[in-house]
Amino acid sequence: MQQIAFNEISAAEVSAIPAMQQLKLFFSFKVDEGCLTGNPIDPRFGIVERDGRRIYRFRSDEDEYRIYFTVEKNADGDNVVVVQRVLHADSLKDFFFRSGMGHDGEDKKLAKSRSFWKLIDDGEKAARK
């Protein structure tokens, strides 16, 4: 079992999701070693990289939400999944539209987007809950 941590921003984003959808979302959110080594078995996982930075992406079963997360080591050396942002698909489509990007090749386009990395930076800088 993985420990999952949230920052203030991602915690607020999750709290805006109805309770039953939260349960369903996090029930299906299972991070395995394949996800962390860049060889995810589950196609719902992906990796967004830029300038040596890596963030992982999980698409919910209904393709309704995206969870963007990093993996850090805790004091015991175990992996901790740190949820940086939780975005509804509609907000992501809006982001693509406003950024002038299409929806195809989502991870590759996000990797090139300064606005996306700013969104992630804001999450990383937020205090953890």
Language-model segments: what does each one mean?
Residues 1-32, 103-129:
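Arg/Lys-rich, positively charged N-terminal/basic patches that mediate binding to nucleic acids
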Residues 4, 24-25, 43, 56, ...:
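Short non-domain terminal segments
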Residues 31-59:
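A short, surface-exposed loop/turn module that caps and links secondary-structure elements
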Residues 58-129:
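Enriched for short, Lys/Arg-rich terminal
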